[in-house]
Curated annotation (Swiss-Prot):
UniProt keywords, alphabetically: Cytolysis, Host cell lysis by virus, Viral release from host cell
InterPro entries, A to Z: Micrvir_lysisE
Protein name: Lysis protein
A Pfam short name: Microvir_lysis
Gene Ontology terms, MF aspect: enzyme inhibitor activity
A Gene Ontology BP annotation from the UniProt entry: killing of cells of another organism
Recorded superkingdom: Viruses
Protein purpose: E protein is responsible for host cell lysis.
Gene (UniProt): E
Length: 96
């Protein structure tokens, strides 16, 4: 009968902790549906395409104001859902 040393047991547990998550991820079925939530989560590609397709308007905030006095201006960017597949991007610059 072979006896395990403490270093052997620790090495085995370390390897097991490294490989076990990847094995579990491999065998999780990909057909499961995500849980239903009241919050709508926007995926990154959808969000980035909405931002790229939004018409851009010049702001009254110059970059120099943000460089020299960032505490005097607030740049606000909001994304509002206007219909099922339509979003509006609102960008505003306000004084504190």
């Amino acid at each position: 009968m072979e006896h395990w040393t403490l270093s052997g047991i620790l090495a085995f547990l370390l390897l097991l902790s490294l490989f076990l998550p990847s094995l579990l991820i491999t065998f999780i079925p990909l057909t499961s549906k995500p849980p239903v939530s009241s919050w709508k989560v926007l995926s990154l590609p959808k969000t980035s395409s909405m931002v790229l397709n939004a018409p851009l308007k010049p702001l009254n905030c110059s970059p120099s104001l943000f460089l020299f006095a960032p505490e005097t201006k607030i740049l606000s960017v909001t994304l509002k859902q206007t219909s099922v597949n339509s979003y509006a991007l609102k960008v505003s610059c306000k004084d504190l």
